[in-house]
């Protein structure tokens, strides 16, 4: 218990020293704002260069194993044409979470629209059960992007943050303390 009190008192003392001078406090706040704006600019550049609304996604389920595992981070690109066998990320109307699956087959309708059927590599049946009740095919507007690369397991932190709120609050608390103490 004494250790916690010592750490708390040390933190309060450091915060008082940091914000005693108004210029230093303002400098810390401006540095944080610049950091956030830089991250936003990088994200927007990725959106422009890849043509995808979400150029980076995390695999949330095991439906694509052994190719992609839960927590893998995928880099996406919006190609002009999709082929059977491509791994795509798509989003169905009314669902918030995008799905990462492979294109099983595709065909062109009479009005020259592409229709796609998807399936997870680890699933026994195609994805028609996931689509809207009277929808049998995906269309191009459902596809968010084509997987062009991945980084294994780096997205597991995202999954933990969403599944365990304690992890989210711990990370946010640590970041706030580091920002306020002047660690940039």
From Swiss-Prot:
Single GO term (MF): peptidase activity
Region (C-terminal short (CTS) helix): 170-181
GO cellular component: endoplasmic reticulum; signal peptidase complex
Post-translational modification: Phosphorylated. Phosphorylation increases catalytic activity.
Keyword annotations: Endoplasmic reticulum, Hydrolase, Membrane, Phosphoprotein, Protease, Signal-anchor, Transmembrane, Transmembrane helix
GO biological process: signal peptide processing
CDD domains found in the cross-reference section: S26_SPase_I (cd06530)
Active site per the UniProt annotation: 63, 101, 127
Top-level division of the source organism's lineage: Eukaryota
Membrane-crossing residue ranges in chain numbering: 29-49
Lumenal side: 50-184
Coiled-coil intervals: none
Regulation: Phosphorylation increases catalytic activity. Ca(2+) slightly increases catalytic activity in vitro.
Alphabetized InterPro entries for the sequence: LexA/Signal_pep-like_sf, Pept_S26A_signal_pept_1_CS, Peptidase_S24_S26A/B/C, Peptidase_S26, Peptidase_S26B
Result of knocking out the encoding gene: Causes a reduction in parasite growth in the host erythrocyte. Reduces levels of the mature form of SERA5 but not of PEXEL-containing proteins.
Function of the protein: Catalytic component of the signal peptidase complex (SPC) which catalyzes the cleavage of N-terminal signal sequences from nascent proteins as they are translocated into the lumen of the endoplasmic reticulum. Specifically cleaves N-terminal signal peptides that contain a hydrophobic alpha-helix (h-region) shorter than 18-20 amino acids.
Record comment regarding domains: The C-terminal short (CTS) helix is essential for catalytic activity. It may be accommodated as a transmembrane helix in the thinned membrane environment of the complex, similarly to the signal peptide in the complex substrates.
Complex and partners: Component of the signal peptidase complex (SPC) composed of a catalytic subunit SEC11/SPC21 and three accessory subunits SPC25, SPC3/SPC22, SPC1/SPC12. Within the complex, interacts with SPC25. The complex induces a local thinning of the ER membrane which is used to measure the length of the signal peptide (SP) h-region of protein substrates. This ensures the selectivity of the complex towards h-regions shorter than 18-20 amino acids. The complex interacts with the SEC61 channel-forming translocon complex and is involved in the import of classical signal sequence-containing proteins.
UniProt family annotation: Belongs to the peptidase S26B family.
Protein name per Swiss-Prot or TrEMBL: Signal peptidase complex catalytic subunit SEC11
Organism, as annotated: Plasmodium falciparum (isolate 3D7)
Lineage: Eukaryota, Sar, Alveolata, Apicomplexa, Aconoidasida
